[in-house]
Amino acid sequence: MRDLIDSDVLRHAVNSTMERYPYFCVELQKKGEQYIFAENHRPVVITNSLHGVDLNTEDSNFHMIAFCFQDNWIILDVFHGMTDGTGAYEVLRTLLYYYCSERYHVKLNDEGIRLAGDAVSEEEWVDPVANRNDLPIPPRNEMSNALNLIASAGLENDHRHTVYSISISESEFMRFNLDNDGSPGTMVSLLLSRAIAKLYPDSKDPIRITLCVNQRIALHTPLAHQSLVGGIMLEYKDKMRDWPLERQGTAYRGMVFAQNQEENVLMGVASQAGISRMILSKESDQERLGVVGYINSLAGRVITATVSYVGKANYREAEQYIRDFRLWTSSAAKGLTVEISAVNGRFTLDFLQTFSSPVFVNAFLKELEDNGIVYDLQDVNKLELPNIKLPWTE
C-alpha cells in the first residue's frame, strides 16, 4: 500500500469483508471417507508478519483463509482448492474498499463491489460442476513429452524456490500487444516460448505453455466462487520459429480462440471432474495421494511452463492507494509458473520457480529488450507460501 498499515482499520475491514463471504468462512474436515467444508464461526486470523500462519490449523482458527501485514504490505493467504484468482480478487476488492475508506477517511464508490449486507445469490454459492451430467465427453488425446526446463538446464539439484518480479507499463505493453496481434496472457506465453527456443534451438521436445483459462464463461456461471481454472495448450511449433512476431502472435491467438470455444472448455471441465471422481473413488487416502502424484507427474511431462492472467484487477478507486501488487501461487508440478497481474497502471510478472537459477528469467528479459519493451526487475525473493494442513496428510 502507499502508507503503513493501520492494524485496527485492517481488523475492521477483514471483519466486514468476511461477513460478505460466508462460503469462505469454513474449515476442511474429514467425514467418513469424504472431505467437506464445514462452517467455521471463529474469527479470521490477522498476524503482523509477512509469512502468515499455517492454514487449517489452530493458528489460523482452522480457516482456509487468513490475512497478515507488515510495514505497508497487506497479504491474503487462501487455499487454491477453495477458490482461484478470480474469487480472491473479489475478496480483495471488498477488503480494499473497507480498508481504504476508513484508513483515508473517504467515501469510495462502491459500484461493482460486494459488500456486507448484500444478498448472496445461489449462483455465487452453488458449485456449478458438482451436479452437471451433460458435459461433453473429452477425447482421449496422447500428448508427447514437452521440453523440460529443469532437465534442459541441469537444475535437478537446485531446490531453492524463488520468485523474480518484473514490472512493465500497462499502457506500453498493451500498445505492444495491439501492434503484434496479442493479448497479455498470449504475448507473455509467446515471449517466454521464444526465449526458451533460443536457449535450446536443437531440442527435439516441443515447447508447450499452458495458459490458464477461466471456466466460468463456458459454464455460464460468472458469479461462482469455486476454483474454476482450466488450461489452453500453446505449442511453439518448429515452423513458427522463423516467423515475424506478429504472425506468431496471430498463431497463438488462433490456438486460444479454438481451445477457448465453449464445448472445448467444457470438455476440460469434464476431464477435471472425471479425475476428481477417480480420486474420490479410491478407498484410502494413500491410494488417492498415489493418483494425485501420477496426475502431477503426467502434467510435468507434457507442460514446459504455465502462464496465468486473471485479468485486470480493477480495484476501483482503491487503486490510488496501492503502490505494488504481487500474485504468488504454488505449482503442482516442478518448474516455472508466471503469474501476471495488472494493477494501478502496470503489469507485474511474477516468475515463480521451484529452483533459483535466473537462466529463464534472463532469457525472457533479453526477449523484452530485443522487442523494445521497457521493464523493471523489481526484486528477487525466496518463494515462501503458508503451509496448509490437509486432513489426508495426517
Where are the regions a protein language model picked out?
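Non-catalytic, low-complexity flexible loops and terminal extensions
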Residues: M1, M82-E90, T94-R175, L368-E394
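Gly/Ser/Thr-rich phosphate-binding loops and adjoining beta-strand/alpha-helix segments
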Residues: M1-D8, D59-I74, A151-R216, F347
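Acyl-thioester-dependent acyl-group transfer interface
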Residues: M1-Q34, H41-A66, K198-E394
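Conserved aromatic-histidine-acidic binding/catalytic patches
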Residues: R2-I5, F79-G87, S165, F176-P184, ...
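Conserved catalytic core of two-metal-ion nucleotidyltransferases
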Residues: Y35-E39, L115-A116
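Histidine-centered acyl-transfer/condensation active-site motif
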Residues: S60-H105, E111-E124, S203, S341-F360
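Hydrophobic/aromatic-lined pockets within catalytic cores
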Residues: T83, L96-C100, L178-D181, L192-P201, ...
